[in-house]
């Protein structure tokens, strides 16, 4: 049988996959089958880790706020601070509170005083 030259479609698909794998090492960079497997694996990991990143950052913010409230004796605990914020309808998310707690603890103290005064 004579050899049938393939069209450009398969080559275009492979070069597209190869462009995704440009930073891989070894066979994961050179062999087409390995490239497709590893690129699929990388997409799965990136999709999973986008959700995980949100959880991790939320945990980090909560830890920072909790540490700051205990160190600067703003409240007894993080949960009491958040409870009073919701009770007084002060709209501050955890990211903003963590930023305040890390960069300028005096502002965290004034926020807590506002909560206590409203009580």
Curated annotation (Swiss-Prot):
The keyword Ribosomal protein applies. Keywords: Chloroplast, Plastid, Ribonucleoprotein, Ribosomal protein, RNA-binding, rRNA-binding. GO terms for cellular component: chloroplast; ribonucleoprotein complex; ribosome. Transmembrane segments: none annotated. The keyword Glycoprotein does not apply. It is found in: Plastid, Chloroplast. One of its GO terms (molecular function) is structural constituent of ribosome. GO terms for biological process: ribosomal large subunit assembly; translation. Pfam families: Ribosomal_L20. SUPFAM superfamilies: Ribosomal protein L20. Binds directly to 23S ribosomal RNA and is necessary for the in vitro assembly process of the 50S ribosomal subunit. It is not involved in the protein synthesizing functions of that subunit. Belongs to the bacterial ribosomal protein bL20 family. This is Large ribosomal subunit protein bL20c.
């Amino acid at each position: 049988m004579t050899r049938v030259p393939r069209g450009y479609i398969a080559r275009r698909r492979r070069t597209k996959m190869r462009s995704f794998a440009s930073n891989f090492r070894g066979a994961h960079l050179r062999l087409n089958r390995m490239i497709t497997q590893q690129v699929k694996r990388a997409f799965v990991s990136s999709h999973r880790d986008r959700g995980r990143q949100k959880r991790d950052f939320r945990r980090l913010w909560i830890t920072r706020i909790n540490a700051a409230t205990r160190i600067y004796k703003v409240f007894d605990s993080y949960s009491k601070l958040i409870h009073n914020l919701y009770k007084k309808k002060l709209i501050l998310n955890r990211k903003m509170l963590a930023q305040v707690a890390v960069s300028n603890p005096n502002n965290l103290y004034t926020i807590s005083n506002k909560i206590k005064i409203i009580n």
